[in-house]
Amino acid sequence: MSFNHQQIEKKWQQYWADNKTFKTENETEKPKFFALDMFPYPSGAGLHVGHPEGYTATDILSRFKRMQGYNVLHPMGWDAFGLPAEQYALDTGNDPAEFTAKNIATFKRQIQELGFSYDWDREINTTDPAYYKWTQWIFIQLYKKGLAYVDEVAVNWCPALGTVLANEEVIDGKSERGGHPVERRPMKQWMLKITAYADRLIDDLEEVDWPESIKDMQRNWIGRSEGAEVTFGIDGTDENFTVFTTRPDTLFGATYCVLAPEHKLVEQITTVEQRQAVEDYLEKVKMKSDLERTDLAKEKTGVFTGAYAVNPINGKKVPIWIADYVLVSYGTGAIMAVPAHDERDYEFASAFSLDIVPVLEGGDISKEAFTGDGQHINSDFLNGLNKVEGIAKAIEWLEEKGVGEKKISYRLRDWLFSRQRYWGEPIPMIHWEDGTITPVPEEELPLMLPKTDNIRPSGTGESPLANIAEWVNVVDPATGKKGRRETNTMPQWAGSSWYFLRYIDPTNTEAIADPELLKRWLPVDIYIGGAEHAVLHLLYARFWHKVLYDLGVVHTKEPFQKLFNQGMILGEGNEKMSKSKGNVVNPDEIIESHGSDTLRLYEMFMGPLEASVAWSTNGLDGARRFLDRIWRLLVNEEDGTISAKIQVSDDKTLEKSYHQTVKKVTEDYEGIRFNTAISQMMVFINDCYKAEVIPTAYAEGFVKMLAPIAPHIAEELWNLLGHEGTLSYEQWPTYDESKLVDDEVEVAVQVAGKVRAKIVVAKDASKEDIEKVALADEKVQEYMAGKDLVKVIVIPGKLVNIVVK
């Protein structure tokens, strides 16, 4: 017999909605638990089966914690600004707001059909002016703190599309859409000074319970390195440039320098003979994105400027080259090259026949660079020193001579915050005709995104907002001064950098949220989402949170106490699901055919939550069979009432199995090991089928344990067991340690050195009693027939050894 999932699921979803079962009150007597999902971008495609995996995990924890007596905050919202909606609007002429609203409605319907216990009264949407008012407010605070500034930055400009592209949108020097040529062009952009927080962003990772791999990715992205900044003079001029190096002890091996093609000195120092070659090279570089330029596998290219630098440590002249693998935005935009001990420098020097001088002992530089450590050679006063001594001595010498100093450098760059797009938060700044910039007065926020039916790119590199003259042009009422609004919009990362705070108090018009409520709910207790957000989103959110901490808005240094990354659900052939491969599984169809409880159970049973696993229709059918098995065990086939097997009883048959199950499921839910919790529930159900009687208390306890994973069928069974309303706030079952231990033990019996039988005796049986039972055993008597008993050795609880002759 099977249960009618469609009827049961609709019934309980309606009940939860009508009764606002999961509405979170701000009560203070209960401990709090804030379970957060990475909110989705509502695309046109709707949910696929990968989305519910993380959402089911947070839902299990939320339902589990409610039953443990926690006040649970479990919200959902929409990260709804972004390129796809704008692209759709460009292609169809429709308003991106309409497209977005339609997509949100689809996502919300699908999410509700999966039975997640969200408090929908806290739903947020980053495109809602009441929400982005506070995104703009945060930007103004960043500006006031000197953390938002305008800078001229090289961007990927696509003349054909009339817009700037992100690095990810450029492939081999052409736009991903349409394959148009892309060039590098300097443009004024808003930047956020995330580098000012670099050390704190590294150090505070110690305070959070995150996967070590994600912490390492963030540390590497920030890329803190200690070394020295060294000044190289340019031969025959008063000019100089600085390089950062982690190995100032290898300066004696620096045989050439490389400047980024965009370095401000290039034009000045290039000789007449080399000018044409340098200009040709600069043209080529314009077509490449930073990602292509720094690809380690690509062929090394570069050109000699004709100029020489003076190595400060030995006075030798070294040639100055330009090469695309040096970026002006990274470090000082110049490097010293020590080809004997660096693979990239070695390849470059070999390609262009430049000198290679070893300064560390070991290796064979005629074959390859030696990147190991050895004593210093060919290094004058550093000879014979090891790495640590050499670095210290070199820095001391550089500082003494005034040509260098100890320095910490970071790989992290400031965050380029401008987007030349329409569908994003307007940046609330005004550029005045006298060259000053001021924020929009805070009382005038939100600065609304104007409605327009022309969101074509402006063609000037500005966003489509530049086309809306009546919005762009402003006059200061006090002075009559003319100004222009900032026409760039914020990136999609903006709204997601603080959204978790708004769930705490989503309708507050006076502040991001009530300070007392922020104190009550922060930090987020568990944040579950994909590892693809390991760096950018998580780093940006941590940065904004630290700024808000410094402003006194929040009281925690870190926003997310525990982070968990679910794995990916792959197609049946172990490939990533994608529309182009035609292997996307739509949850709507599964909910229709198998039910959302089955989908939730299956996705949690596929394997460890953090593993990537292939979708299997057989596995899905197996999950449904398990739920059918539970239903058949507990419900009469004929009349749909509760089975006669379930009785108020103190029958001990299932006692150990039940207490083991409560212990295992409780610990596995806490540890986010849902697959093994389900395995244990399967063991218990098997035991129940073998038992004559199932005590009512055990049936009720089991239904409570099933509820976080399969909430609809659990609610229905709870009602059939004679209860009214929802089990969402019922007390979580408890176990008794003493019931996990058997009263009886199995003891092996050896006759003449071989195990001949196994006997079961009371755990506390005396040696005499154990001996009696052993000697009375039929098999033992068989092997003793015709032999004399010499002695019996009893090791209680383990072994009886019968010696015969």
From Swiss-Prot:
Lineage of the organism: Bacteria, Bacillati, Bacillota, Bacilli, Bacillales
Keyword terms, alphabetized: Aminoacyl-tRNA synthetase, ATP-binding, Cytoplasm, Ligase, Nucleotide-binding, Protein biosynthesis
GO molecular function, one term: ATP binding
Gene: leuS
GO cellular component, one term: cytosol
Protein name: Leucine--tRNA ligase
UniProt GO BP: leucyl-tRNA aminoacylation
Location of the motif 'HIGH' region: 40-51
Binding site for ATP: K579
NCBIfam families per UniProt: leuS_bact
Catalytic activity: tRNA(Leu) + L-leucine + ATP = L-leucyl-tRNA(Leu) + AMP + diphosphate
Family, per entry: Belongs to the class-I aminoacyl-tRNA synthetase family.
